[in-house]
Amino acid sequence: MTHLGLNMAAAYSEKNAHILCFDNNQEKLDQIKKGALPFSEPKLNYLLKKNYKKIFFTSNPSDLKKCNIIFIAEDVKTNKQGISDLTQVKKLITLVRKHANSKAISVLLSQIPPKFTRKHFFNKERVFYQVETLIFGQAISRALKPERFIIGCLRPEKELPTEYKKLLLSFRCPILKMNYESAEICKTAINMYLASSITFANTLAEISEKTGGDWEEVKKA
């Protein structure tokens, strides 16, 4: 279970969804069930304990046949050159293709380059790319109160599958449908904006310190 996957599982369970968390590392799952999380995130353990009757864990991929909606939530790492390693995402897609039932909906949450969803998925009528922008330290609050859902679809003009739409509507925020590539670019654009905002703030804080200004006062203004 990744940071992205576990936080989204906790958030969805809070909306009364029953969650099956898959990881091929049974030892990791056993530790998570005991409350020993592989990372620190405020309120995550609290929600997992609160909703333990709705969250189940498995290392058996055959159990995916039980799922109506399958979220692929691999944390994608990038190297110093900014190149993403998509190996694990591709492996998970292959695993889902092999074990999911034919009526299941697949939703990709991971950060991937434009055209990835269209190229690597099967049965695209039932495949969606959902933009998530969780931040370490704020993941649960952002997962529980999204500003909007950006959903990449094969046919944006069509209604979303009933179960998927019901889950999204439970968060009471706008749902923006668009084609796969537009949604994938949105994810990149949001991340670039967040990164540039941090750089911009750090630069202004440094200027304030060097010139005698008070960055806290500047921020308030």
Model-derived features: positions:
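Short acidic low-complexity segments
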Residues: 52-67
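Short, well-ordered coil/turn residues at beta-beta hairpins
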Residues: 71-75, 109, 153
